[in-house]
């Protein structure tokens, strides 16, 4: 099966264990500190720091060009950075080992586009030793049954996004990074996908979602990091961000505008 898309999407990495100091309890699953990335003379990320906790949905919020995709790619190990540290449960996580723990779902790729949806799902299920019943449950949850025989290149944007979400569900990685997971869905579909993402987190995984639809973000995410011009402008729950801005009834959009 030929691969189309990005190296981040290449399956086959089993989830590993990384040595930690058992005497020191660590709540955060992933810790990012001092992450800085330059493109020539242009700053893409400036000293970005945040944590991701188990069973948490963290929203990365910002306009186009804010650095959201660059941040996800840097955390996933696809982008080298100039400075910064990433740890997993308190232990350093080298770039070469990120794929063992982190599944990155880019925006807009079409994986294995000359293959049928059914074959792509079966391939991923085989790689990660998932049962047919498990895959059938995912297919039903995402409404993919009607397109199983279609080739990936023939899928609409919405169905391609559903396929990508299905592959993220099949993969066992404890941390999933998603770039614009609601892109291509109408309001009803976005709500259903949001509910599904919440269930994924509640089942013990952590999600980091780069989102520009602030209504979806406000409904789905537990905490937020606000990016503008590659710089972290604020982070925390919506309640905490409201307190920081002195706007007790503000929406996420109003908080973002106040801080940027």
Predicted regions and their residues:
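Conserved ABC transporter NBD signature motif
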Residues: 84-98
